Regions:
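Membrane-interface junctions at transmembrane-helix termini in multi-pass inner-membrane proteins
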Residues: 129-155, 345-376
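Hydrophobic alpha-helical transmembrane segments
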Residues: 121, 151-200, 375-381, 394-415, ...
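Interfacial segments at transmembrane-helix termini and the short loops linking adjacent helices
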Residues: 104-123, 253, 301, 318-349
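Signature of the first transmembrane helix
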Residues: 3-61, 97-101, 126, 161, ...
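Membrane-proximal transmembrane or re-entrant/amphipathic helices at the cytosolic face
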Residues: 444-493
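Transmembrane helical elements of multi-pass membrane transporters/channels
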Residues: 6-22, 156, 180-187, 191, ...
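Alpha-helical transmembrane segments of polytopic membrane transporters and translocases
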Residues: 25-27, 39-56, 87, 227, ...
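Helix-loop junctions and terminal segments of transmembrane helices
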Residues: 27, 57-73, 141-142, 203-204, ...
Length: 493
């Protein structure tokens, strides 16, 4: 794929902005509402967004895959693929919204809190709003308009601050939920206009009259989308089922609020690597369709390399500075979430490897492998949570998720080696562990009170790479994305 490095830097930058905005939202909402109402808010929003992420992304992702395969070879098919995916997605989302609205009393009953019913009903409107914005996100992924994607993602982050925090301040929990409806609607409107401005410019073949648009098989989209949708369903449940089991088993809004804070901040490494999956699926779809096995292996190897180099310091520093990060985002009232968050953050590292490599397999059309692995992981996670939460509380929930994530990481690494003929470098892992251990030890020697931990963390993050460079692990090729961005060479749409 051309300009892989520059596109990755753009998308990573947008993910950083988006997630920083997200943590501003979480911090502000948590402080405004307090632990109990923040726990209720977390339950409502997490469940609703989980549904749209897992059910609503299968068809758009399939659209993205097929757009990527034909965008250079036969761009006249772009409108047909888009129209068929839009039709299927609209039918699905309207149905899911109706079912969720009608099921709200049952969901609240299962959570032993009937007062959640009106909030769940209101949150059902998040589903079509979120789906509308996400549809264009995957549309632009398939067309490799990565720079436009990055701009829209940043806009969405800022819109979340404006709407969610503003509405929470004036209207409480209902306002927070309403903000989740308004923010993606704004982004959808911008993306809709951008489609008219940019798509015809880069792909003149898409100017065909409506009657001339080539038909595209809905069956082909659905055959790819259903196992992918199940994968997203099982994966999202693995990352969130512990929160619902904490609520159901412990029946404490306060404990739920603490755990929601722990897992929200603990997911930072995963969110930053999400940009890699955005590029990886369409890139591997394209190289697989072209039967370019050498380029496919190169992309997977490069992704593994990025995971090794970047994931170790992120997870290590987040664990080292957990108390300070929690205090920064939520204040002293959430200090009791420190130990669960440290354990959960380690699990997020394992789960990030699983998620990124799953999209490499999905891009190659091997969608049933991640689907099956995630199903096994979900069953194991539920069983461990039910066993651990009554005995160990929040620590048990975090430990259960981490153990399940470790098993999933091992499984996906085996599948990746088998199907792409690539594997993790044992020497690179060993050197990264050495560097991570060094910065973890130094973290407790450098200033960490108040906001000094941010400066200390930056120094240690740079020091990690300096150490790898010193021992010969970090090469010039590893630094090429940053060099290309600074030099301005290459372009990404």
């Amino acid at each position: 794929m051309k300009n892989f490095s520059k596109a990755l830097v753009w998308l990573t930058a947008s993910e950083i902005v988006f997630n920083l905005a997200g943590y501003v939202v979480q911090s502000a909402v948590g402080r405004i509402l307090g632990p109990a109402d923040y726990g209720r808010y977390g339950i409502i929003v997490t469940l609703t967004t989980m549904i749209i992420i897992l059910v609503g992304n299968g068809i758009p992702t399939a659209m993205s895959k097929y757009l990527s395969e034909i965008m250079e070879r036969d761009p006249a098919q772009i409108p047909g693929i888009k129209r068929q995916a839009l039709r299927l997605q609209t039918i699905l989302m309207l149905g899911v919204t109706a079912v969720f609205f009608l099921s709200s009393p049952l969901i609240a009953f299962l959570l032993h809190d009937p007062s959640l019913t009106p909030l769940f009903q209101l949150s059902s409107l998040i589903i079509p709003s979120f789906a509308a914005a996400s549809f264009y996100f995957y549309y632009y992924t398939g067309l490799h308009f990565f720079r436009l994607q990055a701009m829209l993602k940043m806009t969405r982050g800022l819109a979340r601050i404006l709407f969610i925090v503003g509405f929470t301040y004036f209207f409480g929990v209902k306002g927070a939920v309403s903000g989740y409806i308004a923010a993606p609607l704004l982004v959808f409107a911008i993306a809709f206009v951008a489609d008219r401005l940019f798509t015809h410019r880069y792909f003149p073949e898409t100017r065909a009259q409506k009657s001339e648009v080539a038909a595209f098989s809905s069956k082909k989209i659905l055959l790819y989308a259903w196992p992918l949708t199940l994968f997203l369903l099982f994966y999202e449940l693995i990352t969130t089922i512990d929160l619902y089991l904490v609520k159901s088993i412990l029946q404490s809004d306060y404990q739920t609020g603490l755990y929601n804070a722990a897992i929200t901040v603990g997911r930072i490494p995963y969110y930053l690597f999400y940009a890699l999956t955005i590029i990886l699926l369409p890139a591997i779809s394209k190289t697989t369709a072209e039967r370019n096995h050498e380029e496919t292996e190169r992309l997977v190897n490069r992704s593994l390399r990025l995971l090794i180099l970047l994931l170790f310091p992120m997870v290590t520093l987040l664990i080292a500075y957990t108390p300070q990060v929690l205090d920064l985002f939520y204040g002293a009232r959430y200090a009791a979430a420190t130990v669960p968050m440290r354990i959960f953050t380690l699990g997020v590292g394992f789960m990030t490897v699983f998620y990124v490599l799953s999209f490499a397999l999905n891009g190659a059309g091997l969608v049933k492998i991640p689907m099956k692995l995630s199903l096994y992981g979900l069953v194991g996670s539920v069983a461990l949570n039910i066993l651990f939460i009554p005995r160990f509380g929040l620590v048990g929930a975090a430990g259960a998720t981490t153990l399940a994530s470790l098993v999933l990481m091992i499984g996906i690494l085996i599948a990746t080696e088998r199907h792409f003929k690539v594997k993790v470098s044992g020497l690179a892992v060993f050197r990264s562990i050495m560097a991570a251990s060094l910065i973890f030890s130094l973290a407790f020697l450098l200033p960490e009170r108040h906001l000094f931990f941010i400066a200390s963390g930056i120094v240690l993050f740079v020091g990690y790479f300096w150490f790898l460079r010193l021992i010969g692990e970090l090469s010039d090729e590893d630094l090429s994305p940053i060099k290309k961005l600074l030099s301005g060479k290459g372009s990404a749409k």
